[in-house]
């Protein structure tokens, strides 16, 4: 299948996304003819538009009115033990989207992506377990950003790579095992594109 980055931003001066929706409907028609088993996943954040446009799935994301960040990425996340966070606005937005799209496709809540701080930046191990119980049991298809399943860290202070800036800290190499290079590469560390997280606590 195909994951489409910024799928809702293709047509300028298209506030209701009519042109963008029509474009994706054409692509979906082609895909169904040539690759009928393929799936289309959009980074759009407006399921009522993306699913009509032909996508099988759409992400609720950290931008727009979803209140996704209230769950995991704010000063007081809902899944934090301090119990000061609220999921009220997220639930309202989710239910509204679900009512408009039920039967048309799937709304997906990702654990994160390459543009967000990692889950483990704001949640400890126990909080992560509860967050994943939520992510894996909600309607839709679960999407887990590589490494979130083992609690990989947001590594502060990394040198920006290709305009990644703060996002670079969420893009460190996957830690496959507890070997010196975490099973990611046989290259010397100074040759890594982005530095490995040296704390390695997610292997324990």
Language model feature labels by segment:
Residues 79-103:
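Glycoside hydrolase catalytic-domain groove-lining segments
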Residues 1-50, 72, 100-103, 108, ...:
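Active-site neighborhood of glycoside hydrolase catalytic domains
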Residues 17-21, 25, 84-91, 125-129:
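Non-membrane alpha-helical structural segments and their capping/turn regions in soluble enzymes
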Residues 15, 78-82, 122-123:
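Short, contiguous acidic/charged loop-to-helix segments that flank catalytic cores in large enzymes
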Residues 63-72, 97-103, 130-131:
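Short low-complexity stretches enriched in small and charged residues
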Residues 32-38, 46, 51-54, 89-93, ...:
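Loop/helix patches that line or flank the sugar-binding groove of alpha-linked glycan CAZymes
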Residues 24-31, 57-80, 171-174:
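Acidic, His- and aromatic-enriched active-site or binding-groove loops in soluble protein domains
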């Amino acid at each position: 299948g195909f994951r489409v980055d910024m799928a809702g931003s293709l047509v300028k001066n298209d506030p209701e996304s009519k042109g963008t929706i029509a474009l994706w409907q054409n692509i979906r028609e082609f895909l169904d003819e040539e690759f009928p088993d393929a799936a289309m996943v959009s980074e759009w954040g407006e399921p009522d538009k993306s699913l009509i446009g032909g996508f099988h799935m759409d992400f609720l994301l950290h931008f727009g009115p979803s209140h996704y960040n209230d769950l995991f990425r704010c000063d007081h996340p809902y899944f934090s033990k301090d119990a000061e966070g609220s999921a009220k606005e997220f639930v309202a937005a989710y239910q509204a989207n679900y009512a408009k799209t039920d039967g048309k496709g799937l709304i997906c809540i990702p654990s994160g992506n390459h543009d967000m701080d990692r889950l483990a930046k704001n949640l400890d191990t126990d909080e992560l377990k509860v967050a994943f119980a939520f992510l894996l049991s909600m309607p839709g298809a679960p999407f887990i950003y590589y490494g979130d399943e083992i609690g990989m860290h947001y590594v502060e202070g990394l040198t920006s790579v290709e305009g990644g800036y703060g996002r670079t800290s969420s893009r460190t190499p996957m830690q496959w095992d507890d070997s010196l290079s975490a099973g990611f590469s046989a290259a010397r560390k100074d040759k890594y594109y982005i530095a490995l997280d040296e704390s390695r606590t997610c292997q324990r």
